[in-house]
Amino acid sequence: MSAHLQWMVVRNCSSFLIKRNKQTYSTEPNNLKARNSFRYNGLIHRKTVGVEPAADGKGVVVVIKRRSGQRKPATSYVRTTINKNARATLSSIRHMIRKNKYRPDLRMAAIRRASAILRSQKPVMVKRKRTRPTKSS
């Protein structure tokens, strides 16, 4: 079944839809922007890219759908864990998408998603308030 036909079926009635504040969002896997649109839908396309946080809380997992074996959902996804520094991680994602000519329209969205995940994994520095000495008159 073509992606366009699947989109016509899924776009208004899906268990992943969230309709709030005059906007429609989607919680489906491999939807990089969580937006209910044809381009970012993670279910209907033959090629999809997903970026998730790693299970141990360090690094990201890039999920790419295989072009072959579409009829076997259990083996149709390849999961690659990238646990490097931020610049190398983003460079790896960029190369995975660009060098394989794999959905170049999703390249920037995947990089932004990975960047946000890496930023959320950084430890937060607690700022201490400076105490002023009391004035003595």
UniProtKB/Swiss-Prot annotation:
Protein's GO biological process: cytoplasmic translation; translation
Location of cross-link Glycyl lysine isopeptide (Lys-Gly) (interchain with G-Cter in SUMO2): K58, K65
Keywords from the UniProt entry: Acetylation, Cytoplasm, Isopeptide bond, Phosphoprotein, Ribonucleoprotein, Ribosomal protein, Ubl conjugation
Localization: Cytoplasm
GO cellular component: cell body; cytoplasm; cytoplasmic ribonucleoprotein granule; cytosol; cytosolic large ribosomal subunit; cytosolic ribosome; dendrite; extracellular exosome
UniProt cross-references to InterPro entries, sorted A to Z: Ribosomal_eL28, Ribosomal_eL28/Mak16
Modified residues (Phosphoserine): S115
Positions of modified residues (N-acetylserine): S2
Single Gene Ontology MF annotation: RNA binding
Domain of life the protein comes from: Eukaryota
Residue ranges that the Swiss-Prot or TrEMBL entry lists as coiled coil: none
Family under the similarity heading: Belongs to the eukaryotic ribosomal protein eL28 family.
Protein's job: Component of the large ribosomal subunit. The ribosome is a large ribonucleoprotein complex responsible for the synthesis of proteins in the cell.
PANTHER family the UniProt entry points to: 60S RIBOSOMAL PROTEIN L28 (PTHR10544)
Subunit structure, as described in the record: Component of the large ribosomal subunit.
Protein name from the UniProt record: Large ribosomal subunit protein eL28
Gene it is expressed from: RPL28
